[in-house]
Design a protein with these regions (language model features):
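NAD(P)H-binding glycine-rich loop region in Rossmannoid oxidoreductase-like domains
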Residues: 49-86, 117
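Conserved cofactor-binding/catalytic machinery of classical short-chain dehydrogenase/reductase
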Residues: 51, 64, 91-94, 106, ...
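Rossmann-fold cofactor-recognition segment
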Residues: 41-51
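N-terminal Rossmann NAD(P)H-binding glycine-rich loop of SDR-like oxidoreductase domains
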Residues: 3-23
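SDR active-site strand-loop-helix element
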Residues: 6, 30, 65-69, 107-113, ...
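Active-site segment of SDR-like NAD(P)-dependent oxidoreductases
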Residues: 71-75, 112-120, 151-154
């Protein structure tokens, strides 16, 4: 099966891309940065989710699109809410619109438990709004979807902005969280 993983160079997206490849799928990663973990059986297209032509190129011909293209740093969300809204909401809408155009079978969207919470500030707002768009694309255009709502995720490949990693790093290095 041909699968596109948007944000496939990141923490969660790279793990999902690897598992999809291990299961015999033809995986293409679309990200604004090169993946440190790119496998030989994966393709990557470097680009911005707002570059319509590049995004269309990677989505066209896919059967399933996974969307991990998002910002997730809660501190950064407080400092730069407009950037979060643009990336997490409008980036999702751009991908959804192309999935509708190319008749993708399923859009799998990475969200957060914060989407249904009064915690998480602007990050929560951006995930809730993007979830609403995913659901509305189904209601209006019958674009099948799955929304994944994670808690606080941590592990190998997480970056320094990861909340759990910050707490663990502070504990390991003898600082109070």
């Amino acid at each position: 099966m041909k699968i596109t993983v948007l944000g496939g160079s990141g923490f969660i997206g790279s793990h999902v891309a690897d598992e999809l490849s291990k299961r015999g799928n033809k995986v293409t990663i679309f990200d604004k940065k090169k993946s440190k973990w790119l496998r030989k059986d994966q393709k990557i297209l470097i680009g911005d989710i707002f570059n319509y032509k590049a995004l269309a190129k990677v989505i066209r011909g896919s059967q399933i699109v996974y969307n991990f293209a998002a910002l997730a740093d809660l501190d950064m969300a407080m400092q730069k809410p407009l950037i979060f809204a643009r990336t997490n909401i409008l980036g999702t809408v751009q991908a959804l619109n192309l999935c509708r155009k190319y008749k993708i079978k399923r859009f799998i969207h990475a969200s957060s438990i914060y989407a249904d919470s009064n915690q998480g500030g602007f990050y929560s707002c951006s995930k809730r709004a993007s979830d609403d768009y995913v659901e509305e694309f189904y209601k209006s255009y019958k674009l099948n979807y799955t929304i994944l709502r994670y808690g606080s995720v941590y592990g190998s490949r997480s970056d320094k902005s990861n909340g759990v990693r910050k707490i663990l790093d502070k504990a390991i290095w003898g600082k109070k969280p």
